[in-house]
DNA sequence: CTGAAAGCGCTTACAG
DNA sequence: CTGAAAGCGCTTACAG
């Protein structure tokens, strides 16, 4: 298909057809309330007749408003981060703002270069999954002077704003529950990343303070059912009498449930299992997975809302928003 | 934190410091090979000293190249589409091209408005999940005169290019396999969307041509394990002697496996089960799920490659790329 | 190998 | 309620 580059319609084409100035066309498109109805109608008709679509590069250059929010994620392949992006997307919908997506595939190097690439894009706000830790990156973001929302991890000193929950708190919550249920040989299984380690720490500290024994197995695992099987295997090897396990996410927990079933170990009779994330998978499994509810979508949506509020210059709000944690006790303990 | 809007560094600041013209700075940044090494070094040092980051809106306006590829998905919340986006992202990495993400939440209305919003953004290419069916939308995209890659669904008449597989072919492949394995009471379960219905059609046609009875249950289900349970229930209600079921995706199939286990129905003895998508979940389940391998990432990556090649004006290649289908026979039939 | 001039297509004050 | 002028910060030919 040989397509001739259509000579695109510009704002002065519309102005000429409508018999007004370019500025009136511009105004009709962005502040129609400031234009006399009759004029507005003529302009709108001209826009439709010509199929005029404003050039956003020109608009962004002149107005210093790109209508773009950057979102930086470790990987869009992990459903929890995808859900967070979806929350941001829904928050932005209706404002005609678009998302510029940066996926750095868990590579620190790609993260830095993406941050710099996004920095040149006149973003109106930036939302990142995780905290920005590098001093030079923080300085870069600060120099941009745009709203920045760090999500998932909480910190006392966000670059600008943060929305998330305490990973140590999640671990501690799970341990407290197990202790209260009379379990005494506890274990944690999860990824060997910053979030996993924080959950492990909160879990084991609380367990030991409660006079229970506790092991933590953190490994380079993704969000894979098969990894849950492996973690279970390692946990039982390290601490054979384990009677309660907290996994860093529901997928790992379901993997462990499958492995426990294959081994004929009763849940929760022999071992109690708890996940994190409240995924549909855990709800549909039998026995239904107990979990700590952390809703990825409900991190993304407020992050988007906060970014919008900051862009509008209203609702300063708190610097740090803790979305909190809820224990969802179901059948696995 | 009260941040003063940093007076941003512009290209002429760099030019002044380096003692060259703006144009030489510009050239150093995009075609360093055309600049004398000594000059280049001076410019690069000035860029670093000042922390200069080019304004991409101005660059896009002047060069008519935005460095942005649009990606339109029904929802980023479905992991298969997220994987496709990840494939596109990886394909674009290293070219300093960014993804503008449009998530329309399966709403035809939002899809149309997003398409129009993206149309104004000087995209260098557009990748969409699914086919663009509306004539007005197709006309809009054609008028943009940019590469367009439709993914997942195949068609003989793409707007520009298409990468995907035949949904009817997938259904037919599953049915042929079941027939060859001596099954005679077949069923399909899946979503009541365009892809689900096409898979159902291919499946039932082939089944009946093979003298097997076949029912197809298509419902408004997402990609949920619980939906797989429900579909199984409905299938057995409609056709109690069903001995082989093809599900539109692996998640539904695993849901059915859980339900079959709860009901004490042997797999594959009593019922054979096959999914589609080759998800890790199916591989980690026991018995391991047989599936038709369709790799979402491997649809996204070539889509990105094709877009890049078209942007570069090289490698015309075929208009339609069929990524093909592979039957992965494991333990469930 | 380097630069002066013109222009990309909008919007921002400001004036009336 | 509407418009003339200036400018946003780059890059594109073109010339030398």
Label every model-predicted segment.
Chain A
Residues 40, 66, 85, 200, ...:
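ATP/adenylate-binding site constellation spanning eukaryotic-like Ser/Thr protein kinases
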Residues 49-55, 109, 129-131, 257:
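Short gly/ser/thr-rich secondary-structure transition/capping motifs
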